[in-house]
Swiss-Prot record:
Residues 72-131, 216-283 are annotated as: Disordered. The lineage of its organism: Eukaryota, Metazoa, Chordata, Craniata, Vertebrata. It comes from Homo sapiens (Human). This is Putative UPF0607 protein FLJ37424. It holds the Pfam family POM121. Signal peptide: none annotated. Belongs to the UPF0607 family. Residues 243-252 have a biased composition (Basic residues).
């Protein structure tokens, strides 16, 4: 719909045109002016009534759109302390089975199995791969009790009369507990029947700094490292060298060194090898212009040859026509001469 402006009159209702009175034609030319013409009068715009209807827009409230967040339910696993106790029981039972299967030949090795078992129980709580959540206080208490038990076992073992074998002791190669050895001591190798796997795991996990501070357990920890019979013989003959060997083993027991990535190899052309291929020469703008000019000349020559061929063909046509005309003239002249005679 296109709205048009309609002039407003007071006497007539809106949107109704006033009737136009046509006068008879006169001799004078009518002059249109804004006074005597409706078209040139002052036009007033039509007023459009405002909309009376009301629209109620119902927008959803923000409270309905808010989704309440759900808190995740934390489930406390009650099976973890049971697993720790199961690991301890397994260590104790395996130590007892190893003692039953392989009886130790020396009394000293049999007596040292008790502090070793206590040390295995001590390190089993540290060697547990799954940390105990919520039982930190109980774990610390059990560790303290186990360390106290291990120290009591070690003190009782050395107080009963068992000594430490030494190659430089004055009386029978045995020193009483509490006296220092002038040179580093070397204990006999463990019997193959006795298993020392919990102590090895403790050494791997704890290292040297985290071992207990009691002298008996320290010496047991040193004895737990695997040794060959040849190495034992050399250590008995030369104790300072054995100490150096132990320090070398301790250095090697640290974290493995990370190898740095090797840089990529750069291939170079030697004298014996062939040189790299020569690069193509880059054409200068002058050479490009010369090449374009030569191409244009070739095109012009080709065009000129075509034109010349056309011209020659035309010339040959004209010559042929001339020859034909001459022949006709001769024949006409011969006919006229024969008729005159």
């Amino acid at each position: 719909m296109r709205l048009c402006l309609i002039p407003r009159n007071t006497g007539t209702p809106q949107r109704v045109l006033r009737p136009v009175v046509w006068s008879p034609p006169s001799r004078k030319k009518p002059v249109l002016s804004p006074h005597n013409s409706i078209m040139f009068g002052h036009l007033s715009p039509v007023r459009i009534p405002c909309l009376r209807g009301k629209f109620n827009l119902q927008l959803p409230s923000l409270d309905d759109q808010v989704i309440p967040a759900r808190l995740p339910k934390t489930e406390v696993s009650a099976e973890e302390p049971k697993e720790a106790t199961e690991v301890k029981d397994q260590v104790e039972t395996q130590g007892q089975e190893d003692n039953k299967r392989g009886p130790c030949s020396n009394g000293e090795a049999a007596s040292t199995s008790r502090p070793l078992e206590t040390q295995g129980n001590l390190t089993s709580s540290w060697y547990n791969p799954r940390p105990l959540e919520g039982n930190v206080h109980l774990k610390s208490l059990t560790e303290k009790n186990q360390t106290d038990k291990a120290q009591v076992h070690a003190v009782s073992f050395y107080s009963k009369g068992h000594g430490v074998a030494s190659s430089h002791s004055p009386a029978g190669g045995i020193l009483p507990f509490g006296k220092p050895d002038p040179l580093p001591t070397v204990l006999p190798a463990p019997v193959p029947g006795c298993s020392l796997w919990p102590e090895k795991a403790a050494l791997k996990v704890l290292g040297e700094d985290h071992l207990p501070s009691s002298p008996g357990l320290l010496m047991v920890g040193e004895d737990m490292q695997p040794k060959d019979p040849a190495a034992l013989g050399s250590s008995r003959s030369s104790p300072p060298r054995a100490a150096g060997h132990r320090s070398h083993k301790r250095k090697l027991s640290g974290p493995p060194l990370q190898l740095q990535p090797t840089p990529p190899l750069q291939l170079r052309c030697d004298r014996d090898e062939r040189p790299p291929p020569a690069k193509l020469p880059c054409l200068s703008p002058e050479a490009l212009l010369v090449g374009q000019a030569s191409q244009r000349e070739g095109r012009l020559q080709h065009g000129n040859m075509r034109k010349n061929m056309r011209v020659l063909s035309r010339i040959s046509k004209f010559r042929r026509l001339r020859q034909l005309l001459r022949r006709r003239k001769k024949t006409r002249q011969g006919r006229r001469g024969g008729s005159c005679l």
